[in-house]
UniProtKB/Swiss-Prot annotation:
Quaternary structure annotation from Swiss-Prot or TrEMBL: The RNAP catalytic core consists of 2 alpha, 1 beta, 1 beta' and 1 omega subunit. When a sigma factor is associated with the core the holoenzyme is formed, which can initiate transcription.
The species this protein was found in: Bacillus pumilus (strain SAFR-032)
One GO BP: DNA-templated transcription
Similarity-based family: Belongs to the RNA polymerase subunit omega family.
Function noted in UniProt: Promotes RNA polymerase assembly. Latches the N- and C-terminal regions of the beta' subunit thereby facilitating its interaction with the beta and alpha subunits.
Catalytic reaction(s) noted: RNA(n) + a ribonucleoside 5'-triphosphate = RNA(n+1) + diphosphate
Gene: rpoZ
Protein name: DNA-directed RNA polymerase subunit omega
The keyword Ubl conjugation is annotated on this UniProt entry: no
Molecular functions per Gene Ontology: DNA binding; DNA-directed RNA polymerase activity
Amino acid sequence: MLDPSIDSLMNKLDSKYTLVTVSARRAREMQIHQDQQIENTKSYKFVGKALEEIDAGLLTFEKEDQE
């Protein structure tokens, strides 16, 4: 079983597409800057660490209003 689960992650963001985009951007940011918001992560891959940050509520996403 995956941890964090897709159900708990979907409670944090509005769609699977947003989840993929936010986690991929955060993973790339962690690769470049070598920074993490969680000290002890279960995952050793950057995408897994980003998903753990989303699940912990440390990483959020806000939509911009398009005019």
